Amino acid sequence: MPRSRINGNFIDKTFSIVANILLRIIPTTSGEKEAFTYYRDGMSAQSEGNYAEALQNYYEATRLEIDPYDRSYILYNIGLIHTSNGEHTKALEYYFRALERNPFLPQAFNNMAVICHYRGEQAIQQGDSEIAESWFDQAAEYWKQAIALTPGNYIEAHNWLKITRRFE
């Protein structure tokens, strides 16, 4: 049974109903419809914390989806799952892949910055300030890109950039 039929969440049900209506009225190929169905089911599984199921759906959606913009969001969501699982190298890979297809994803830049900042903090705990600074510099670059795309957002990152004198 498709995940959209078994989900009990009101918002997810509403999204599924609207998505199903749009799939019927918007002229799309059967492959595009199938890709969206996998994407929708992946989002539903992800929202419930069923990451393995979400990944299966997202991988299938990436196999079918041909539009780069739509693929960027699928890849971004895969990155989110890897981030949640502590698989930061994989997460960074998927955020990069998402940005290759859609360079206007400030949330991907932000998440990459958060991972780099976290790695900088880890390096400090291990006593390696040189490596930490390198990670912090990389985090700053990603945060600058996120802020440039959405001025007024990422206030904490903006403050960190000012405090650490990394904001130009």
UniProtKB/Swiss-Prot annotation:
Membrane topology: Peripheral membrane protein
Cross-referenced SUPFAM superfamilies: TPR-like
Gene Ontology CC terms: chloroplast thylakoid membrane
Keywords: Chloroplast, Membrane, Photosynthesis, Plastid, Repeat, Thylakoid, TPR repeat
Location relative to the cell: Plastid, Chloroplast thylakoid membrane
Repeat (TPR) residue spans along the chain: 35-68, 72-105, 120-153
One Pfam family per UniProt: TPR_1
Entry's family note: Belongs to the Ycf3 family.
Name this protein carries in UniProt: Photosystem I assembly protein Ycf3
Organism: Nandina domestica (Heavenly bamboo)
